[in-house]
Regions:
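Hydrophobic beta-strand segment of the Class I
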Residues: 73, 142-143
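Class I SAM-dependent transferase core
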Residues: 27-74, 82, 112
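A short glycine-rich, Lys/Arg-flanked "PGG" loop and its adjoining helix->strand segment in the class I
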Residues: 88-92, 155-170
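A short acidic, Gly/Pro-enriched loop at the edge of an enzyme's catalytic core
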Residues: 130-142
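Bacterial N-terminal signal peptides
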Residues: 10-22
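Class I SAM-dependent methyltransferase SAM/SAH-binding core
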Residues: 74-132
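Core SAM-dependent methyltransferase catalytic element
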Residues: 209-224
Length: 224
């Protein structure tokens, strides 16, 4: 029995629609992460796990980025302020830390923590989606720890971070490896370092080096 031409066209349209519908999903899987899905403020306590100093190695990260006394630095997606206070201690009273987050609850938590611990060299910044609202050409280093997989428009965010760096400034991105180890997000929510490098290249940044010393994470350092 011959199939009517109209029915053939309808079947082909359904097949084509299914194929095109699958493309964004495949791209999402390839890119990794769940862009726009933010860390819930109700889980802030998880960011201050007692053993985090052991596997996060904040001093080595700051050393690798050249963060020292009087440095001006940014903590992007600062969350509970765990890294913020360590940066503030490192740069001292002559330095400045911009602690940025896009969630007001996080900014409030950072301000409480900074006040409780007596730091006067931290400025909390409520960023916009894909724009941390940092002053142009003013930062020696910018650090984004365990937050890259949450960013919705990564190239735009990286472009804005690049604008905030001084000519010789450095951007450090730390996020969890794809093997699923460690205390980070589920494997399907993680982002490949190759994707980060590709995004950074599109944003006009260059990979300087990759540091291998973290137990569960990769650490990429970029410059202009």
């Amino acid at each position: 029995m011959e199939i009517p031409a109209a029915l053939k066209r309808a079947a082909l349209a359904l097949i084509a629609g299914a194929i095109f519908a699958a493309v964004p999903h495949a791209q999402t899987q390839q890119q990794g992460g769940h862009p726009g899905r933010l860390f819930p403020p109700s889980d802030l306590g998880l960011l201050d796990a007692p053993d985090r100093d052991l596997w996060q190695r904040p001093d080595q990260i700051m050393d690798a980025l050249g963060i020292a006394d009087a440095s001006v630095v940014g903590d992007i997606g600062a969350g509970s302020g765990w890294f913020t206070i360590r940066l503030a201690r490192r740069v001292g009273p002559r330095g400045l830390v911009y602690a940025e987050d896009v969630q007001k609850e996080m900014i409030n938590a950072i301000q409480r923590r900074v006040g409780r611990e007596g730091f006067s060299n931290v400025k909390a910044v409520l960023g916009r989606e894909n724009d941390p609202r940092l002053p142009a050409s003013s930062l020696d280093a910018v650090l984004m720890v365990d937050a890259y997989h949450e960013v919705e428009d990564r190239v735009t965010m990286l472009s804005n971070l690049a604008k905030a760096l001084k000519p010789q400034g450095r951007l450090g991105i730390v996020d969890f490896r794809l093997d699923g180890t460690g205390p980070g997000p589920a494997p399907e929510e993680r982002v490949s370092p190759d994707v980060v490098v590709s995004d950074a290249t599109k944003a006009g940044l260059k990979l300087i080096r990759q540091e291998p010393f973290l137990q569960y994470q990769y650490f990429l350092i970029f410059g202009k």
